[in-house]
Amino acid sequence: MSKAKSEFNRRAIPEVARETHWIAPDGWRIRRIDWDLRDDSGAGATKPRGSLLFLPGRGDHYEKYLETLQHFADTGWRVTAIDWRGQGGSGRLLPDAHVGHIDDFSTWIADLGAFWVEWKSNNPAPHVIVAHSMGGHLAMRALVEEAVDPQAVALSAPMLGISTQGLPYAAHHAVARILGALGDPTRAAWKEGEKPMSPLNVRGKIL
């Protein structure tokens, strides 16, 4: 392992990266991080290979991928990553900050499409998307809906669907709609005593 890799601090934002917010058309603040190869004067210190947009997964935040993103930057890419609306540093959609929620995936597609237009105009080609898990699903959907037009896409474990145990998707959709109507679709899927996982305070110490 190289000295640079062995000394990488996974718990700190690299000094060469900057965190800001992009304002969506409806005013929502989307957190972003950028590795810009230009020097302080704005001149191009190093001509980039191109521009890379990283899209994280469900419940993710870009801090989980800092070492990978730094690697992309070290190999010559101008790198940007975002936190999806409602997770990470992009606010919450419900009063309970520990409950993930979105009204419809189309909201995320709209955010991505609007962000893409601005990001693409401010960064040199080729424009590449790298996406993980749910980010991979949203990247594929955005491509199909022509919300983005990258020159290349790389997907890591993309969320292609949900296992239905052999039952038709339509049946699962119907059950989900019925349960949502009978209960509260915005509450946590598991009550505190039902969660098949460690308590939140214990999980926090692992990260």
Feature-to-residue mapping (PLM):
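Alpha/beta-hydrolase-fold enzymes
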Residues: 138-207
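N-terminal cap/lid segment of alpha/beta-hydrolase-fold proteins
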Residues: 2-44
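Glycine-rich phosphate-binding loop signature in dinucleotide/nucleotide-binding domains
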Residues: 45-47, 119-125, 148
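Alpha/beta-hydrolase active-site loop
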Residues: 100-120
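Gly/Ala-rich beta-loop-alpha elbow adjacent to hydrolase catalytic centers
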Residues: 130-135, 139
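Conserved alpha/beta-hydrolase
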Residues: 62, 69-95
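Active-site glycine-rich loops that stabilize anionic/oxyanionic intermediates
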Residues: 49-52, 57-60, 134
